[in-house]
């Protein structure tokens, strides 16, 4: 089967997040070492990453949350995505998970690359009525890492109290060099207000090209189509109760 063109926008992207007991951390680390190739080979998977997460309080090297793990998967079809829970990878995480959640996403905008690819294609944009998820991901240049980490605390502190923020946490493929953030917002206006009007975040945006922090970067925005499972795994705030989503105990 030929690979879709780089500009092809997937119909469905899913974010799976698992909360595990601390006693299961060694088993989670083993899965992170062995499961990525199996995840990429699942039928219907166009692009996939297994990710560690952070608490979202600082987005720095000391922010790791070893009791929460995630997978971001780009699918060819919704039917293929529906088979994930019964796949060897899905069952493997379910065996050690205390709780879990799946977020169904539609790409709205995306720029940049991840591992040399454009996994979300070239979305045309458009209006979104309802919650949006913002994903930022970068591979830091080692010589610039210290400067980057010093710039993060003011942004993290500002994000914590941002109006309309429903959930936020860090994600990463490795402890230091491959960093990202996930944030969920009540609507696009709240995201735009924080991203472009908050002084700390604007300062970081301005410094990015001049500091040369990133060897590779990607910024994407998604419509949140559904939240299935225990949204507290995402750190969802009480305001999230206003969002329509399927909840399963």
For the regions a protein language model found, what residue spans apply to each?
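Extracellular/lumenal glycan-associated surfaces
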Residues: 74-77, 186
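Short S/T/G/P-rich N-terminal loop/turn motif that feeds into the first structured element of a domain
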Residues: 1-68, 78-84, 96-180, 190-197, ...
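A common structural junction motif
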Residues: 89-97, 201-203
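An exposed tryptophan-centered "aromatic clamp" motif
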Residues: 213-214
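Active-site/pore-lining binding-face segments in mid-to-C-terminal subdomains
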Residues: 186-205, 209
């Amino acid at each position: 089967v030929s690979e879709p063109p780089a500009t092809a926008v997937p119909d469905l992207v899913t974010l799976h997040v698992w909360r595990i007991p601390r006693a299961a951390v060694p088993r989670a680390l083993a899965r992170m070492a062995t499961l990525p190739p199996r995840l990429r080979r699942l039928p219907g998977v166009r692009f996939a990453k297994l990710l560690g997460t952070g608490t979202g309080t600082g987005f720095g090297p000391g922010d790791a949350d070893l009791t929460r793990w995630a997978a971001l998967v780009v699918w060819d079809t919704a039917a293929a995505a529906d088979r994930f829970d019964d796949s060897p990878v899905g069952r493997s995480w379910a065996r050690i998970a205390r709780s879990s959640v799946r977020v169904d996403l539609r790409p709205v905008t995306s720029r940049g690359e991840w591992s040399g690819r454009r996994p979300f294609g070239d979305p045309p944009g458009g209006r979104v009525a309802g919650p949006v998820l913002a994903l930022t991901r970068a591979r830091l240049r080692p010589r610039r890492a210290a400067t980057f980490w010093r710039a993060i605390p003011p942004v993290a502190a500002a994000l914590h109290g941002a109006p309309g923020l429903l959930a936020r946490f860090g994600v990463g493929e490795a402890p230091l060099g491959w960093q990202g953030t996930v944030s969920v917002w009540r609507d696009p206006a709240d995201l735009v207000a924080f991203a472009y009007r908050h002084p700390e975040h604007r300062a970081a945006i301005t410094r990015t090209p001049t500091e040369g922090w990133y060897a590779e970067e990607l910024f994407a925005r998604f419509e949140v189509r559904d939240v299935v499972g225990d949204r507290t795994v995402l750190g969802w705030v009480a305001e999230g109760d206003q969002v329509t989503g399927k909840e399963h105990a």
